[in-house]
């Protein structure tokens, strides 16, 4: 397991527990492991109850954190991937298709970063091209045609900023998705599972309900980008994060985010199955409420929600 800087003391205890577990077990060893386990639990509860916003950002980027492809089979069944935007190509930074949630059909779409070097390159580190946003929109319109809810998973450092992406209309593709998603006639639930950065996240992030995993962030710019603009150096990222209001708890207070999905103690990377279960329950509950509304009620609420954004408040 990989550890972050602020987890060094936890690592020390867990290393001791691991080494002792390989020793011949006797009453003394068992007692020591029990003692260390209790100490570890207390330390973890203390550490994660007072995380700074920068530490939350670090957790959202944890190398072992579950990505969309990890969570997909744990939340949904009968997934059938659909490819391409029918215009240019198939962007592998986003994966989408038909699936079932608690035996009910849904259209699921998620950004995928990739785990190792090969898969990171394959999925372009989760940075979508215009054809990715157009593919996502094609699947959403298909879901609308067959009256299926849409569930999107957001995890990206931003839309791909390359020249080719700009030539193919990156800004138009994102803007088109904002327009179309705001008027979809089916329930739309969006979940930030890691990084939710800039227009890259917004392109699949407009819906009836926006949920966030506890240790994720949602921002117009990365902390490093903000620090580079304000202080001319990315090294000030930890300082500016505190005033950006980008973590799940702060965004819930500002009513940008509707619900915060709890993660296992220590973060989602410590228990994929519990994380997936929490997401599945939260999404199912939201879809149940939304499905009981008429199209007019949902769209009216969605409009009111979008219009409430942008109110000024001192950070």
UniProtKB/Swiss-Prot annotation:
UniProt cross-references to InterPro entries, sorted A to Z: Acetyl_CoA_COase_a_su, ClpP/crotonase-like_dom_sf, COA_CT_C
Keyword Nucleus part of the UniProt annotation: no
Enzyme Commission number: 2.1.3.15
Group of enzyme by EC: transferase
Compartments in which it is found: Cytoplasm
One Pfam family cited in the UniProt record for this chain: ACCA
Positions of the CoA carboxyltransferase C-terminal domain: 36-289
Keyword terms: ATP-binding, Cytoplasm, Fatty acid biosynthesis, Fatty acid metabolism, Lipid biosynthesis, Lipid metabolism, Nucleotide-binding, Transferase
GO biological process: fatty acid biosynthetic process; malonyl-CoA biosynthetic process
Catalytic activity field: N(6)-carboxybiotinyl-L-lysyl-[protein] + acetyl-CoA = N(6)-biotinyl-L-lysyl-[protein] + malonyl-CoA
GO cellular component: acetyl-CoA carboxylase complex
SUPFAM superfamilies attached to this UniProt entry: ClpP/crotonase
GO terms for MF: acetyl-CoA carboxylase activity; ATP binding; carboxyl- or carbamoyltransferase activity
Pathway: Lipid metabolism; malonyl-CoA biosynthesis; malonyl-CoA from acetyl-CoA: step 1/1
Function per UniProt: Component of the acetyl coenzyme A carboxylase (ACC) complex. First, biotin carboxylase catalyzes the carboxylation of biotin on its carrier protein (BCCP) and then the CO(2) group is transferred by the carboxyltransferase to acetyl-CoA to form malonyl-CoA.
Family named by the database record: Belongs to the AccA family.
Subunit structure: Acetyl-CoA carboxylase is a heterohexamer composed of biotin carboxyl carrier protein (AccB), biotin carboxylase (AccC) and two subunits each of ACCase subunit alpha (AccA) and ACCase subunit beta (AccD).
Stated name of the protein: Acetyl-coenzyme A carboxylase carboxyl transferase subunit alpha
Source organism per UniProt: Francisella tularensis subsp. holarctica (strain LVS)
Designated gene of the protein: accA
